[in-house]
Amino acid sequence: SLQTNDGGLIEGDEPEQPEEPGDAIFSESFANGIGSFTTADIAGEQAWNADDQYKCMKMSAYADGTSVKNEDWLISPAIDLSKARTLTFEQAFGPYNKSMDNASQLYTVWVSNNYSGDVSTATWTQVTINYPAESGWAFSDAQATLPAIGAQAHLAFKYKNADGDETLTWEIKNVAVK
């Protein structure tokens, strides 16, 4: 309730309640394919694709028995990041028992406030996410703090690999921004 200057109450004028922490402003499960995301294939023949069996998006640079050079982006539609938000998603890496030492350089999450369809002309900022200790195909929860960069921001999952480097498959599902 609000008070008038003479101390009287004004009924019915309740202040706006803040958003509940559990309310997602954006979500995409990938259960039915790529959804509202798009892809950008910068290098290599491989690309992000929907996995109908595991209900996720996945990317691998493994082809014809070897790891090949790739750079591929999985990009969200515009998301309101006019204030800091929390990103959550599930991720899995394969094959089994591979090192995750270089994960933070190869399997990364980025945000941009000026992406307009070409990843090479946008300014991207990497956000820190958590990774499992080793690969093993099991989905685990990942989380990141997304900075306040504007009402028309884009989120991207970037997969990178060099020729001959040991590569992992990266699977992503149940993306949410809260």
Model-predicted regions and their roles:
Residues 2-21:
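Ser/Thr/Gly/Pro-rich low-complexity, disordered linker/stalk segments of secreted
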